[in-house]
Amino acid sequence: MVLFQFYICTFITFNYYKFVLKVDSSSRRLLVIGCGGRARIQRYLSGYKQIRYEQELITDALDQRARIQRYLSGYKQIRYEQELITRKNYGEILNKYLSSGDILLDLAYNLETRCLLKWCHDHQVCFINTSVELWEPFGEAYKNDPRLLTLYHRQMQLIEMQNDITWNQKGPTAILDHGCNPGLVSHFVKRALIDMAQYVLKQKGIQIVDSEKIKLENALKVKDYPQLAYLLGVKTIHISERDTQLTKDPKKVNEFVNTWSIEGFVEEGAAPAEMGWGTHEKNLPNGIYFHKQKEGPCNQVCLATNGINTWVRSWVPSGEIIGMVIRHGEAYGISKYLTIRNEDDNNNNDILYRPTVHYAYLPTDSAISSLIEFRMHNYQLQPKLRILNDDVIDGADEVGVLLLGGHYVSAWWTGSVLDIHQARKLVPGQNATTLQVAISLVAALTYCLKHPNEGICLPDDIDSEEILDICLPYLGTWVSKAANWPEENDKIRKDWQFTSFQVEN
């Protein structure tokens, strides 16, 4: 049995101002697990105007005091201790720090979501995380079938747990996959569909048959997002991201450099490429695997190749990119949420509409160099790891959703362009990437306080306007516009097939 060390970074007793949130949270406590790049959230929470601290306990498997010393010194109510979480003792540790009505925020990697989720459900504790995790993601049993390494497989395990007769269907709110991506990008999709529909009705209305125009207006009025995507003709959704943050300290030999959790990046990048599979897809890429029919929604496929070796063409506001199809939770959540079934039959095979959904990620130059070295070392992680932060001198993180193949608008991008200078003005001590994650987590915490009894939710299941109202002021330049991409004679435009986007590695 392999024991992983995880970081319990912050244990926070907090109040939200009643006049802001209209809820009484004075007795709630928040435990944050994790002290990597994502977990620098505590720096942001310490300064967030809607949160007032009374007590905070930070514990970690390692001595991380130096990383947050100014917060330990600046807030008298904060304590720091060291702790180790394993599959054997997680219940004991959670019992020590949490009780009914509290919130657990899990930012660690390889800390099994099912275990934490079940404990929180049984103890009436709300739960938030940024990804669905396992204790041992690369066990021997997974080697013969890449489908067992997918996030889809993990989601099916969660569904199986919820279908058990001992599970109360509602219970405390648990928001899964709510970082930036997965997380915010699900809310970006909804905003993109609204903006795109309004643009089409205003600018392209003369091209639309009256009956279709009425349908589009009705779907817009009631915010029926699957119908909007279907009526607009959206065939593919890229979660397109380019990170151009530049360090003054170049990557060294045998060092992995990134702007966020390196261990998390390597784990998901080395896993099979995974995507939501659209109903318009006719051409099958090499090495494709389908999931067994009638076992879940069957909205995803995976490839035999891993994510960091699967590349596609995509686009962000700064221009065309080539990005990696790394597995991400939003590919499951968005494609499932936008699925439309024939009304007379709920059979898994009887799907009227679903878009293809996947990540297209181009990280920093430092991270690209690190990945090349990682591959050169036969996928063994470098001995030195470094997360870029104060050493970043320029650059931005462009992350959004690219809706492609529409009847009236061929491409529409909605998302955040946050440069390092904007990020530092908003919250000192953050890079652009961690701030985009941090504010999403704050929004999820706020949602939990206002809606504490909604059971298990993906980002697609909760009110996007509530989330975006909090997040938009911290996302830098907000973009939601038609994109002139690809060019008219590009092969992609012929039928918007996944294989047309693919690039030889």
Where are these regions (language model features)?
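Rossmann-fold NAD(P)-binding glycine/threonine-rich loop
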Residues: 131-170
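C-terminal catalytic/substrate-binding lobe primarily of soluble NAD(P)-dependent oxidoreductases
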Residues: 195-505
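A short, basic/flexible loop-to-alpha-helix module at the beginning of a structural domain
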Residues: 6-27
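Rossmann-fold cofactor-recognition segment
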Residues: 76-87
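Conserved N-terminal Rossmann-fold NAD(P)-binding element of oxidoreductases
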Residues: 32-34
